[in-house]
């Protein structure tokens, strides 16, 4: 299912900072990018 930007932001609002950092790490591993890389 494709989420809109608003849906994603609502999901992130419910996360803790630890959960967010874990998500970013998993995202980088999945897409082989760094957080500073343009998407």
Curated annotation (Swiss-Prot):
One GO MF term attached to the UniProt entry: structural constituent of ribosome
GO cellular component, one term: ribosome
Leader sequence residues: none
InterPro entries, per database record: Ribosomal_bL12_oligo, Ribosomal_bL12_oligo_N_sf
Gene3D superfamilies hit by this protein: Single helix bin
Claim: Ribonucleoprotein is one of the keywords in the record: yes
Biological processes per GO annotation: translation
Keywords: Ribonucleoprotein, Ribosomal protein
Family statement: Belongs to the bacterial ribosomal protein bL12 family.
Functional note: Forms part of the ribosomal stalk which helps the ribosome interact with GTP-bound translation factors. Is thus essential for accurate translation.
The protein's assembly and partners: Homodimer. Part of the ribosomal stalk of the 50S ribosomal subunit. Forms a multimeric L10(L12)X complex, where L10 forms an elongated spine to which 2 to 4 L12 dimers bind in a sequential fashion. Binds GTP-bound translation factors.
Name of the protein in its database record: Large ribosomal subunit protein bL12
């Amino acid at each position: 299912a494709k989420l809109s930007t608003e849906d994603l932001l609502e999901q992130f609002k419910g996360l803790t900072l630890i959960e967010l950092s874990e998500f970013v790490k998993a995202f980088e591993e999945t897409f082989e990018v760094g957080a500073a890389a343009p998407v």
